[in-house]
Amino acid sequence: MSLDDQGVASFLTDVLIVEDDPTQAEELACYLRRARLRVEATVSGSLAIHTVARLRPKVALIDYNLPDLDGVTVAERIKRLSPGTAMIVMSGRIDRLSDHTLANTGIFTFMNKPVALGPLRSAVLTLIRTTTRTGLPPPLPKKRLLPLSFGSFSLT
């Protein structure tokens, strides 16, 4: 993030995807690019940290299970390098993350894998709008699990 002539935060990319599965990373990237977002992807936590330092993304989508670092460690380091980056952690197992952990690391929310692309895009666009306006990620919600619905069945 840098400051423009009026002192407003500017970002070099919209979304950084941190996902070690190239197929999943490409699927997410293609879907988000259709919403006209600038998207970069990395395959490890250490590469993500290097990329954040260079690009200052508005939003980071972080897989919890990476080959070198876990998603919480990556989020902690991103928060130190780029406090304006909003973060979403994705995992096949959400029971590992407590609200306390999320609050302490600045993770906005977490999503269960496989990720539903529509709700993910909505969350990303909301975070980008808020981050672009203020230069900071939005306040952390009290409830971090995004609601899911399947037909008439709904989880909130």
Question: Each predicted region: which residue ranges?
Answer:
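Acidic catalytic/metal-coordinating carboxylates
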Residues: 44, 70-73
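Alpha4 helix (beta4-alpha4-beta5 surface) of REC/receiver domains from two-component response regulators
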Residues: 73, 94-112, 122, 126
